[in-house]
Amino acid sequence: TSAPELAGADITDKSPCTVSSSTASISHGTAMAALLVAHDYGIAPDAKILSYRLVFSDDSAGSDCSGVSGIDKNESSSLINTAINDGAQIISISSSNKAGTTPLKWAIARAMSQGIIIAAAAGNDAKNETDVTYEKWSGVIGVTAIDVNGNRQDYSSWGEGVVSAAVGGPVKIRDYSSGEL
């Protein structure tokens, strides 16, 4: 990455296929990486990040993302399995997933059976999302967003599986269209 805050960080893009990410996706991913491994303020600056790209509404997947059995290589279930195969110890998913597919359930179960921790965002829909996001499955650590005073952010979702919180703002992140913080 070219973000100055990540200079010297151990980050490897392990995406199994071509994903063209929007500026918003790049900014979000870089901000999450910086919160983890930035040398000045990351919570685990010596950690190694294996990065896997999901496809969001403004992103596009390459033709090499077609997978087997109808599961594309850039889908959450496939990426979780790839991370397991790559030796991940903690899987942090800073997005929500309302699909709730059987392959996703089994990928999460496989991670849990191998002692791999999965933490996932509760979502940004400002409602109870107990039945529709990653944390609906036992063992996934659901994370809601709070402000610097410990109050849930107005936009953040919550639910039965939410057992943790992380500061969701105000946080300065790099704007990749301008390069500014």
Predicted features along the sequence, with ranges:
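Subtilisin-like serine protease catalytic core
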Residues: T1-T12, S20-I71, G100, S138, ...
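Short pre-catalytic strand/loop immediately N-terminal to key active-site residues, enriched for Gly-Thr
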Residues: C17-A24, S177-L181
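Extracellular/periplasmic catalytic domains that process cell-envelope and extracellular macromolecules
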Residues: G42-A44, I84-N85, A111-S113, Y134-W137, ...
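Proline-centered loop/turn at the N-terminus of a beta-strand
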Residues: K48, G115-I117, I141
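Substrate-binding/access-modulating region of protease and related hydrolase catalytic domains
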Residues: D58-E135
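Extracellular S/T/G-rich loop segment that most often corresponds to the catalytic His/Ser-adjacent loop
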Residues: V132-L181
